[in-house]
């Protein structure tokens, strides 16, 4: 259908539209008109992706000079593929309406591991090895040697792409990862470099967060993208953690030992080259005097280790004299390494700021701040000059150099914590240095400054106002949308007591209490008797899950549960978990029914949708607070309190509730889907916890369902499931939660649509 969204003609590839999709498009258009940033919370399963794509593509076509590109960031590869499929649908609808092929290019970009087609590289399992192997076949000096001697190893796909792929831009169309690989096989071009080259003139690019937020990668991939782009972060409820991880470095004793052997290897290589080809080292010295910008003008294939973060003025100036020659630089790294090793020989925990660390460094081993900032770049230049083929071996040393660059660049927003042992195993000496980022806004700030509109969206962003605070930006629109339903298909309830009236909670004091564990088991047992097909249960941590399940086994509860449904458990091993998931789905298909026990913040809670019968009930055992004794977390809470005036308790509750909402949101994946959401902890009933749930869940959480016993909860569930089992046709939805074009244009509907969005 063709819609008029606030004066913009939008092609929408379906015959009917949800009212909230229309409302979402209105808010989105206002954000783009204002050329600002937006935070939008849209209920899960209401067609967020297609609304985003339809509106922004229409905007691109109406104002080609205002918005040149859509950069869509998603979290996992399956999600990226989903977005590309929606885009394909949208485009074929455009072509069917206009009767001609559009000059439109949309593509997905992923790591070499997912795109490489070279027969020697594809069998490798880990991304790091794939990158290293690729570099050893495509580095500029490897290719130069191959020009002289054709028998040397090389990558024919890259050679072919380099020779012919650049003149011909990618033909218009939509490409997912498999399409790119197929095209690569057909033409004999490298799909990875083809995709990287093509994102510059693509209309829509879909890739993962790291390509924009991790400065080491963003510098390589996203540097050339124009300012007039719209960036969308989808499923962005965890975006602050992604930002923090991309800027943090952990150094262990093992890493440092491997740095030592890296340095020895480099030392030998330098000596060998001095004897055979001293001119090469002289050339490098000359380049470094001219400034880093010249030194890094090497080919794209060599830019394998990018720089963590360097402002432009540093790249312009010459490298300090003390680290210009290769031997001096290696000596410099040795002194740095010795100092860090010495710092790791501690008996108690040390916490200090980067400036304090630097002054200690200057006093002990006379290393100044300025040469440290050049460490990462200087190492990159050296590895290039020495023609090191396999860069994966040098990742420990690269990590140390990145740490040096970061520690000398940022004085605020970071902390250094040195722990002599892991808290969980205090007897084993296992020292580790955490260089931990506490300010999520550091990584995302360049994105907000560089692109004219950044949209942060997810099903669970409540409370909305905390995101602009922790990411430090000013949105022009902030809105949360309700879910318009023809029948109430979600049933949230809070179970706070067992049948024996014992309060149930996962808090630390009552965690080991046998009565609480028994009541939790009883809840799962009774639910497994009334809920059809699949139940997903989330615990607060792996430890808690293991101890609870062991206790249920002793009490014979597990045996009774198994009579109703089969049990599957998520473990920390990825391969085991995928098998468990597969079998869980099989058991649901066969009608045997299944229960999946998993962990909030685990793999299952983040990316896996339990559509229809795979998840008819989600049970949240306890409030999923993060492990609060961790020193890194304490430092971050302190920073948030001082810098952004966010109270510790508010942040912890916000963090726990967004994860709880994320877990229970897995059950509802569309308006025809239905499911129970059981919050099993008396603390959920408190106003401060309940108020932090997304608006679309809060609306259906009635006062009568706030503090139930297990029996009352089961009665509510029975009644709800019986209602849901009645036949439900599309006709029942029409005009209420599903609109045709005529209905959408009526005044009454437009008035209703106005009320869906709640601005902040």
From Swiss-Prot:
User: Mutating residue 75 to W: effect?
Assistant: NER deficiency, slight deficiency in basal transcription, decreased 5'-3' helicase activity
Which NCBIfam families does the protein's record reference? rad3
What SMART domains does this protein's entry cite? DEXDc2, HELICc2
Q: Where in the cell is it found?
A: Nucleus; Cytoplasm, Cytoskeleton, Spindle
* One of the GO biological process terms: transcription-coupled nucleotide-excision repair
PANTHER family linked: DNA REPAIR DEAD HELICASE RAD3/XP-D SUBFAMILY MEMBER, GENERAL TRANSCRIPTION AND DNA REPAIR FACTOR IIH HELICASE SUBUNIT XPD
Please tell me which stretches of this chain the record labels as motif Nuclear localization signal. 682-695
Q: What is the effect of changing residue 48 to R?
A: NER deficiency
> Which residues belong to any copy of the Helicase ATP-binding domain?
7-283
Its recorded name reads: General transcription and DNA repair factor IIH helicase subunit XPD
